[in-house]
């Protein structure tokens, strides 16, 4: 069962369980001696197409060039390489990616004035029973346990393979 960021637009395609955690949105940028926690005119900033706050950010930062991407994870590498100046991600995703893959290269800072992302499980629209079962299970988990599990996920040990090289391009396996 995939976890997903809730949005009204996505609700037309899938069912969402109740949100099990919320997390702030952040900007992710290259770490530099003169790193500032602001966006500047002309910057190229990636935002996943499914983030609802896209139009709100365009109003808040009209001088920025917004580039929609399929997901935030692939955009981290583009920020590191300088192809993008920044990206919008959730704090949980950003903290994990920076700690494990870009510890001395990227940093993040909170985006002021925007609502938090609500993370929940997503289901095919034809599976309302499964959604109800998951909702009951989630409601039985104390909030302190959800926090503990989230912290455990963030502090996973470093992996030694370069997943960017593995997953940076689509590939297909054809069998006959």
Question: Across the structure, where does each feature detected by a protein language model lie?
Answer:
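Proline/Glycine/Serine-rich low-complexity intrinsically disordered segments
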Residues: 1-176
